[in-house]
Curated annotation (Swiss-Prot):
SUPFAM superfamilies: S-adenosyl-L-methionine-dependent methyltransferases. The gene is PEAMT1. Pathway: Phospholipid metabolism; phosphatidylcholine biosynthesis; phosphocholine from phosphoethanolamine: step 1/1. Phosphocholine binds at S170, T175, G176, R180, Y187, Y265, Y397, Y411, R415, Y417, K483. It comes from Zea mays (Maize). Belongs to the class I-like SAM-binding methyltransferase superfamily. PEAMT family. PANTHER family: PHOSPHOETHANOLAMINE METHYLTRANSFERASE, PHOSPHOETHANOLAMINE N-METHYLTRANSFERASE-RELATED. Keywords: Methyltransferase, Transferase. This is Phosphoethanolamine N-methyltransferase 1. GO terms for molecular function: N-methyltransferase activity; phosphoethanolamine N-methyltransferase activity. GO terms for biological process: methylation; phosphatidylcholine biosynthetic process.
Amino acid sequence: MAAAAAAVNGSLDRLDVHERKAQKSYWEEHSGELNLEAIMLDSRAAELDKEERPEVLSLLPSYEGKSILELGAGIGRFTGELAKTSGHVFAVDFVESVIKKNGSINDHYGNTSFMCADVTSTDLMIEANSIDLIFSNWLLMYLSDEEIDKLVERMVKWLKVGGYIFFRESCFHQTGDTERKFNPTHYREPRFYTKVFKECQTFNQDGTSFKLSLITFKCIGAYVNIKKDQNQICWLWKKVNSSEDGGFQSFLDNVQYKATGILRYERIFGDGYVSTGGAETTKEFVEKLNLKPGQKVLDVGCGIGGGDFYMAEKYGTHVVGIDLSINMIMFALERSIGCKCLVEFEVADCTTKTYPDHMFDVIYSRDTILHIQDKPSLFKSFFKWLKPGGKVLISDYCKSPGKPSEEFATYIKQRGYDLHDVEAYGQMLKNAGFSHVIAEDRTDQFLSVLQKELDKFEKNKDDFLSEFAQEDYDDIVNGWKAKLQRSSAGEQRWGLFVATK
């Protein structure tokens, strides 16, 4: 047994040596000219950098006076920006000419230090619990899976509790147009990185365990704007005590919207959709918005992105889709690859997310805001984010006026919903400042759509069971029948709301 383990370890070590040689050779070839185009491997580097660099910096937590470890620092595209307000930046890169160039550009800040080292090397010794922010941009894609596993564990140990890790990678495929003799880059699916970081757990000397909590996960908007490419993806994680509850996001991803659960829902709602009526109601409702090419749309609770792709492809709009569920955004990003449209996705909590005033022409939300307890505050945010003349369109679960039955109240509590009657819902939009508020009870349409979805689903039972279990089938059928019963009884309602700023 021990001999077998030693043989496996020896084999991995040889693979790691080969990996490091290949990556070093690759970067020595592409760092002959120490300029932006060479480092970004793209002829449009200057154009991309102008939009992308401030975007990346805007995604970071406050680092004023903080200690920053920058891994794979390159010629210092971010080093100088970080040094302007941080306490100290320790920049590391494994190509000597590159890190020397970085030092010559950024040493004058007086709070920077530079080291030529490979991040996988044990020679890189950082004191435990000493770093506030670990930053890397295009680093992990040049490491093997095994090297990433080891590095993540070390990074978590280096971080202070409450400290952050930010990293950005090229996923799925190459983006830069620079010609390459060979390319050892690992263009992974983003779910690989999410899994590795999410599952990492470390312990301090007294046995207390720590994990990483996901704060942000999104594609870089600059690459969507300029190249219509969603493969540039970044993550922001926070080091927390392992006993910390994951909150509502954890409930969504582990209970209501597990990966298999999302795929189940998609089978009844239709390809790309996880909300009532799928493509049919999307087309009907979106038509009410009079969308024009170039307009910017925010989709709150975007799910797996079907409605966003539809708006971007049919109307030429730029759509920003946000959802609290990591699983939803993971599917949306995977499906965006190759679409070549202006759609970007982000894991975000709409109750804490901020946008500049007057940023969007339309805010769109389908059967999502039922999860939000403080709707008045959210609607005030919507009002601020919209341009004058902008529209909001919301479909959502509602209830009848008055006190719900004991059974319906239990259902609402179990799901964590906050439901209002249609009139009260519309009044909240008016109170937030909106004009021309249309509040329609669409329960009859809801019943019709539910029945149509159920009939089609039952007809395709054998097809569904070829991929899913009988239990999954029963859950869907029973869930739809229960919704039909609650809505037929007049308890559960479905509202459509359109309003203008």
